[in-house]
Amino acid sequence: MTAARLGALDPTVFELAARRVMARCDELARITSTPGAITRVHLSPEHARVNRLAAEWMREAGLQTRQDAAGNQLGLLPAADPEAPVLMLGSHLDTVVDAGRYDGIVGVLMAIEVVRLLQRRDDDTSGVDAPARSPFDFGLEVAAFSDEEGARFGKALLGSSAVAGTWDDAWWELEDPDGTTLREAALEFGLDPGRVSEAARRPSELVGYLEAHIEQGPELHARGEPLAVVSSIASARRFQLVVEGEARHAGGTPYDMRRDALLGASEAALAVERICSTQHHIIGTVGQFEAFPGAMNIVPGEARFSLDLRGEFDGERDRVWDQISRELDDIMGRRRLRWHTREVHNAPALFCAPLLQDVVGEGIRSTLVPGSAVDGSILGSGRPEDPTTLFSPAGHDGMAIGAITDVGMLFMRNPDGVSHHPDEAVSLGDVALGIRALAEAVAHLGAEHRRT
Amino acid sequence: MTAARLGALDPTVFELAARRVMARCDELARITSTPGAITRVHLSPEHARVNRLAAEWMREAGLQTRQDAAGNQLGLLPAADPEAPVLMLGSHLDTVVDAGRYDGIVGVLMAIEVVRLLQRRDDDTSGVDAPARSPFDFGLEVAAFSDEEGARFGKALLGSSAVAGTWDDAWWELEDPDGTTLREAALEFGLDPGRVSEAARRPSELVGYLEAHIEQGPELHARGEPLAVVSSIASARRFQLVVEGEARHAGGTPYDMRRDALLGASEAALAVERICSTQHHIIGTVGQFEAFPGAMNIVPGEARFSLDLRGEFDGERDRVWDQISRELDDIMGRRRLRWHTREVHNAPALFCAPLLQDVVGEGIRSTLVPGSAVDGSILGSGRPEDPTTLFSPAGHDGMAIGAITDVGMLFMRNPDGVSHHPDEAVSLGDVALGIRALAEAVAHLGAEHRRT
């Protein structure tokens, strides 16, 4: 199948595919550990349920399914040559706590639709029961990663890191909030921790990795455009910080005798905002914060908080961390507090491969030429000759997968820029455009691959 | 028994009594829900255990014991006239989380020793088995209150409020951190919530209430004095505050689109410190603080924190709360956040009764006259002619009991001013002086009472 042939398809097939994706997002949203909200973390019973459902949908789309040794759900559409490498398409099915229904999930379901649209059956000669296969020199594989958010064990990208072969056995001792280790959770899920390396793929097995994702910010909406090429994924570091002071009686301890850890941590959180907000493309967030012993009438002797620090460039991000560290020294010194930190995540910026940026751009161009768009209201509002390119401050599975293969990403417009929240949204029309653009991108890559 | 007769006792009896008190403080410290630390909250299994032990010690000292309908442990030494009112002596046996071993506890154990020292048996005529009785026109009753700290249900003074007849049935619905209501906890403890009013005492039943307590600050230590008369107990209000913003993705949400509840709450905590620290005898403390949903990669949409606000005078304290409220309006308005609060405790300042201040002062004077002190090292460092008088920024059971009777308090020196912390301390010598001063105070009151 070529890009030209895909363009000749009835545009309503993309809308039908998008309707199925939206309905399935709703169906997965009901699989949650928190009734009335969406929370689905790594190696939970909900994880097992969505994997089973995704596998069913993959098989229904003609894919050969398996769950790998890290709990990732995979679906393969092989090439004619069974030894040929694969292009991986996908995203993750886990969520943050009290999440929206599209982050990650929509990308997995769109990948299934794209593979369904692109597959070929050799039914001309051998009948309708012939297995589906990739029309390209490479196979197509849908990956539903098991952990991208890191909501349970603090460490993000566990699923894609296993695939990338960058697993660190120290992670087995990470604990969730209930004190269950990653090792215990894996065993309970039915995985063998000793075999996690079997999930790792070799670079030679892969042509690349393509992912569609909602934008987790307001940029496309502000520009009035439905789709964008992603240029790079933010570099990210995550820290757990501890401030130590002295627990004292709230009534009897005068201010000048206090060493209040909570106030030191409060100043630190505000310093992060003050320092980062004046920088370009640097974002620091304190998302967790707790004071101990946590009684109304005791001056807190300890405070713990998290810092998530992202930047477009590693060096810039590290320079800002140094600045924050110096500021913490000042604050804690002035308040006679001690502070220390543990880095729990460190991922360098991931630059999307030029070829994959090109094919995603071609996919968007092919999709948004006047007359071809599914959603008439969007027509003409895009700039097909010059697809928008965005930097992603949010992390994605590509950050891990980038260790073994080229990565490309497609962003879809997010009406309010809201993500990691129940109000997270994407329109049916934009998902239809996204499915088409991703399919076009894969077809362009197929054509490029054949030429090289 | 008169003050003069008490003064004729061998001073070593006070040291022996103090040794028993210190040993029992150590024994009670081992009854905790948190091994390695001291935590003993209202209506817990540990509460039941310390009540049983206190009752045993009370009986061993000749008292008639009972546990009242609010879980307070009481021990009575009746007067010759069984209808006579009683002077209540005591404090509380509950603790904050990760507490010291003296706050409250030492006052209960000292009261037992004082009653043991003062009691009379009519053994001259009727033999050794005659029951002990008060030598005064009033009975003596030791009260070990069940809840002063409020560590479990947020509301402090539950035990003494029941005794004061100021119980509010709305409190039954208060929840502990596990979601157990006060009603459920009472039932589980074996109490009948419908009968809590039976714990209430009438003003006519009481002569007054006297309590010995460690100072929860550094003032006596700084002055080099072992004991002080307490003039008043701080007025206190406690609030639970909620800040509401919007949970957003930590990577994708630019600073100008954020409504970060944690940063608003951090500013609020610092504002409390800034406002209160410039006032005389006003102390505000943020002891609890939590952010939600509490994930590293989500901008917090909600933050909850507590405020404990104390002052020597109610009006001054309320004026400062108004100032804090206006500051919160400013902060939250600027950050596009909402805030609301629930007041969980409001106690007016309690002024100790002039007569009880006088007898406590007499008790200290009688104790610290040169030659009578137990601990020679302290001798002469006090100023017996003019006992130190201190305001108590910390709350005490007298705040509740003050609703039905006169209150008097005696403070003992606290070497580092530390309280609500494992390092809380008081010396054996100061406890011995305290026991003597409290016994002398009761004897002086007995003499006063006879005169009137």
List each language-model region with its residue ranges.
Chain A
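N-terminal capping segment at the start of a domain
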Residues: 2-44, 171, 343
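Active-site-adjacent substrate-binding region
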Residues: 15-18, 29-30, 181-231, 269-274, ...
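Zn-dependent metallopeptidase/amidohydrolase metal-coordination segment
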Residues: 21-24, 29, 87-91, 376, ...
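A non-catalytic alpha/beta surface segment that caps or lines the substrate-entry region
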Residues: 33-78
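A short beta-alpha structural unit
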Residues: 39-43, 285-294, 306-313, 338-358
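Alpha-helical metal-binding/catalytic segments enriched in His/Glu/Asp
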Residues: 89, 98-148, 237-243, 249-275, ...
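Midchain, well-structured core segments that form catalytic/ion-binding scaffolds
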Residues: 135, 147-148, 152-314
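His/Asp/Glu-rich mid-to-C-terminal helical/loop segments that flank catalytic regions of hydrolases
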Residues: 231-233, 249, 253-278, 326, ...
